[in-house]
Design a protein with these regions (language model features):
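A generic alpha-helix propensity feature with a strong bias for hydrophobic helices
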Residues: 8-9, 133
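Absolute N-terminal positional cue centered near the fourth residue
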Residues: 4-5, 31
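Polytopic transmembrane helical bundles with strong interfacial aromatic enrichment
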Residues: 23-151
């Protein structure tokens, strides 16, 4: 009875067991999931730093900017983990790889520019955030297209 899990046949039928995945798919899935987990850990650290280390040092508006960076950082760290799991379950198509890559770029550009803006007050960094936001949008659209293309 140990091997009678109700989803076992279903998972195997959909090619989701590790043995049925190609090496590239496993590498991509591991990269996305582990990167997402590390990025999430960093997001938690940045959130704690903002709440405890920056509260007395930043103006309220700049603290809000920092918090916005943390929020999008965390949403998209979880998005990276999700994309990695989808890659593991469905295989790592080009669209899924691009989705993961753009999500990571979005975190770096969007959240990163907000972090630096909050710390330095350098206004031109606000112009970088939309590039990161566009990366997020394209990443989610590519993921949707990749899922719609699966049979």
């Amino acid at each position: 009875m140990l091997n009678s899990h109700p989803l076992k046949g279903s998972i195997k039928a959909h090619g989701c067991l590790k043995n049925s995945l190609g090496k590239d798919t496993i590498i991509v899935a591991k990269f996305l999931i582990s990167t997402g987990a590390l990025v999430a850990a960093l997001g938690i650290a940045f959130g704690a730093f903002g709440a405890h280390g920056l509260r007395a040092k930043l103006e309220p508006r700049m603290l809000e900017v920092w918090q916005t960076g943390v929020e999008y950082h965390m949403y998209h760290a979880l998005g990276l983990i999700l994309i990695g799991l989808i890659s593991h379950w469905l295989g790592s198509s080009t669209l899924i790889k691009w989705s993961g890559g753009l999500m990571l770029v979005g975190i770096l550009l969007f959240s990163g520019s907000l972090y630096v803006l909050a710390l330095t007050g350098t206004g031109w960094l606000g112009a970088i955030a939309p590039l990161g936001g566009s990366s997020f949008i394209i990443a989610w659209i590519l993921l949707a297209v990749a899922l719609l293309r699966t049979s």
